[in-house]
Amino acid sequence: MKSIPGDIPQYLLIKAQLQERIQSGALKSGDKLPSERELCAIFNTTRITIRESLAQLESSGLIWRADRRGWFVTPERLWLDPTQNTNFHKLCREQGREPKTALLSGVLTTVPVEVMESLQLQPFDQIYLLTRLRYADGRAVCYCENHCLPARVPELLQYDLNGSLTEVYESHYNLVYTSMHLSFYPTAMPAQAAQALGVMEGRPALLLRRLNYDQHGRVLDLDIEYWRHDSLRIEVDTH
C-alpha cells in the first residue's frame, strides 16, 4: 500500500474515486466493476491495495461480491414499513423488484429453547422448522427461519414452500396474518446464514424477529430473518 507520511493512504484515495463514480451515477446499480487485475492497472497499484479499497466500499454497502463473478454495485435497498403487514413477495413487487424464495430445508422437530416462550409451547413440543433463502432480482438478500405451529397448519410440509408462506396459509388453512410483534437490531452473520447468503461469517447483518398472529388473535408462527446489511432499510411514517 503506497502512502507518504502525513498523506492519505492510497487505498482510501482509490476508494474515494470509486465511490464518486457510484454516487454520481457513472456506475449504476447492478453494474459490474472491473476485475481486480484491471483495477490494479487503472490505478497503477497492487492487488493488496485494491482489495483494501474494495473492502472499504463493501463495508459502506456500496458494492457486493458475487462468488466467482466479481464485484457489483449494490442495488437500492428494499424498504420496509413495520406498521404495514405485508409479505416479502408483495414487498418486492411493489418496489419493482423480482422476488424469489427457495426452501433449503423443512422438518418436524422439537421446538428450540430460544423460541419456546414466544410460541407459547412446552419443552419437547414439536414445530415445523423451515429454512429458506430469499432473493431480490436474483440476489440472495435474506436467510429466514420460519417456526410454524403444527396445531395451526397440520401437514404443512406437503405443500410447495418455495414461495409465499402467507399465500399457503390463506389458500390451504384459511389463516390470515393480521398483526405482529417485530424487533430488529444489528448483529453478526451466523455461520449457516452466511454460507447460504455467500458472505463471510461474522459480517454485519440486520436481524428481524417477527412473531405473527392470525385473524383469531392466536400466535401463528415466528420468523427469524438475517438480512445482508446492505439490502434493507426500515422506515416508519407516523402521520
UniProtKB/Swiss-Prot annotation:
<keyword id="KW-0805">Transcription regulation</keyword>
<dbReference type="Pfam" id="PF00392">
    <property type="entry name" value="GntR"/>
</dbReference>
<feature type="domain" description="HTH gntR-type">
    <location>
        <begin position="8"/>
        <end position="76"/>
    </location>
</feature>
<dbReference type="GO" id="GO:0003677">
    <property type="term" value="F:DNA binding"/>
</dbReference>
<dbReference type="Pfam" id="PF07702">
    <property type="entry name" value="UTRA"/>
</dbReference>
<dbReference type="InterPro" id="IPR050679">
    <property type="entry name" value="Bact_HTH_transcr_reg"/>
</dbReference>
<dbReference type="GO" id="GO:0003700">
    <property type="term" value="F:DNA-binding transcription factor activity"/>
</dbReference>
<feature type="DNA-binding region" description="H-T-H motif">
    <location>
        <begin position="36"/>
        <end position="55"/>
    </location>
</feature>
<keyword id="KW-0238">DNA-binding</keyword>
<dbReference type="InterPro" id="IPR028978">
    <property type="entry name" value="Chorismate_lyase_/UTRA_dom_sf"/>
</dbReference>
<dbReference type="InterPro" id="IPR036388">
    <property type="entry name" value="WH-like_DNA-bd_sf"/>
</dbReference>
<protein>
    <recommendedName>
        <fullName>Putative transcriptional regulator of 2-aminoethylphosphonate degradation operons</fullName>
    </recommendedName>
</protein>
<dbReference type="GO" id="GO:0045892">
    <property type="term" value="P:negative regulation of DNA-templated transcription"/>
</dbReference>
<dbReference type="InterPro" id="IPR000524">
    <property type="entry name" value="Tscrpt_reg_HTH_GntR"/>
</dbReference>
<dbReference type="InterPro" id="IPR011663">
    <property type="entry name" value="UTRA"/>
</dbReference>
<dbReference type="InterPro" id="IPR017722">
    <property type="entry name" value="Tscrpt_reg_PhnR"/>
</dbReference>
<keyword id="KW-0804">Transcription</keyword>
<dbReference type="InterPro" id="IPR036390">
    <property type="entry name" value="WH_DNA-bd_sf"/>
</dbReference>
